[in-house]
Amino acid sequence: MAQLKLEDLLKSGAHFGHLTRRWCPKMKPYIFMEKNGIHIIDLKKTVSLADDALNAVGAIASTGKEILFVGTKKQAKAIVAEQAERAGMPYVAERWLGGMLTNFSTIRQSIRRLNSIERMEIDGTFDMITKKERLMLMREKEKLVRVLGGISKMTRLPAAIFLIDVKKEHIAVREAYSLGIPIFAIVDTNCDPEFIDYVIPANDDAIRSIELITSSVADAIIDATAVQKDDEDAAATNLASEAQDEKSEA
């Protein structure tokens, strides 16, 4: 089972919060101490809360549902894309478009447009249009891929979202909360944890901290889906065996 270790969190700098003057008082329960004007996060609580979060993520993934990864800040975008793809999950790593969740039907239209252009490339349509038309379509595709590429295979709303930096991704938080979609998040000392269902208190600016926690979430999903597949394979084998037994008895 995926698990975060205190030593690894310490090495990644996950305990370093923000300047004390920039803190959110609601993060007080997760703060260990103040040192040189910086809040230090209580990593024992991080480990405990991360365990709860990873178990919950695994439970969702084991049902075959999707968890949307969100992280558009410079330090997070490459990690979010890599780990979400590794786990076979959708992601937003460039820009959160208002309505991505609350107006998903409209977003789906843009995704269908992207898929349509990609089919045109494959089926030979590009060979039958002018160079100018082809260039316009390619520019449109590049724009759509940049913003929607990570969710191009998402056909319905996610069962949950996992995000880095609650403050930066406040629109995503607001949309998920309004729809009752569970929110998992790395929450730093300058962020408001009020609307987050599963708070993972940690440094959301350090690349190593982001990578460690995000990869653990991906691991939890991969482990859970592997167990699900094993269970399905075992069930299929049992059904086949029972059918063979009935045939033999007949």
Swiss-Prot record:
PANTHER family: 30S RIBOSOMAL PROTEIN S2 PROKARYOTIC AND ORGANELLAR, SMALL RIBOSOMAL SUBUNIT PROTEIN US2M. Belongs to the universal ribosomal protein uS2 family. This is Small ribosomal subunit protein uS2. Keywords: Ribonucleoprotein, Ribosomal protein. It comes from the Bacteria. PROSITE patterns: RIBOSOMAL_S2_1 (PS00962), RIBOSOMAL_S2_2 (PS00963). It comes from Chloroherpeton thalassium (strain ATCC 35110 / GB-78). SUPFAM superfamilies: Ribosomal protein S2 (SSF52313).
